[in-house]
């Protein structure tokens, strides 16, 4: 009882307002804010490097659709393939088809960060093919901005009372009333704070050491830091799907491991290999 009294009761309405029957939710708004800040940061880097403005113009669309498609497919195929392979159009469209007929607009409720990362990496490759830019230069610039977007995405999860933490007795525990009345780790907030700090570190390194660091360093640091933290914070989270209960590590942790390995390679080995050549 004492732990419950010390906890923070959390029960915001995930819907900001309703416009002509279409629900405008904090989730979508915070996603948009995160992408907007990333847009500003990357645009700043393009101008700082004196890159042709015409090359920057299509970048937003490649990133937006790459992240959205990758994150959606990642959620559907990694976390609930049985359902979505039998409800294919719900994987593609932001609606839910009702059993009695008809449909309901829901937005894309399930988005996976690992899938979004893969989608972004692929879309940037397509962008670089079109603009003839160096791929590592572009992913480094995107990497500097990525943590601020990740921060807002986790705040979006917090407003949705989703990706909740395990039951705890810490004094800053949240009671997610839409889930139950148990005090839990605000894991979404842990990630949001960590990613915001990483963003500040990235900006500091870019402004002070970008000319001294090899190509691929920022890309590697971003992958390593985000997915290492993600791996460990998963121990404080409830599993998202039932099949994870029988796993030693959950799906988020297994998917994080290859990204950490790739990140370490680009931080410590990629530049050296290029230098030898």
From Swiss-Prot:
It is found in: Cell inner membrane. Pfam families: LGT. Pathway: Protein modification; lipoprotein biosynthesis (diacylglyceryl transfer). It is an enzyme of class 2 (transferase). Its EC number is 2.5.1.145. One of its GO terms (cellular component) is plasma membrane. InterPro entries: Lgt (IPR001640). Disulfide bonds: none annotated. It comes from the Bacteria. It is a multi-pass membrane protein. The keyword Aminoacyl-tRNA synthetase does not apply. One of its GO terms (biological process) is lipoprotein biosynthetic process. The chain crosses the membrane at residues 22-42, 59-79, 107-127, 133-153, 186-206, 216-236, 251-271. Keywords: Cell inner membrane, Cell membrane, Membrane, Transferase, Transmembrane, Transmembrane helix. One of its GO terms (molecular function) is phosphatidylglycerol-prolipoprotein diacylglyceryl transferase activity. A 1,2-diacyl-sn-glycero-3-phospho-(1'-sn-glycerol) binds at residue 154. Belongs to the Lgt family. Catalyzes the transfer of the diacylglyceryl group from phosphatidylglycerol to the sulfhydryl group of the N-terminal cysteine of a prolipoprotein, the first step in the formation of mature lipoproteins. This is Phosphatidylglycerol--prolipoprotein diacylglyceryl transferase. The lineage of its organism: Bacteria, Pseudomonadati, Bacteroidota, Bacteroidia, Bacteroidales.
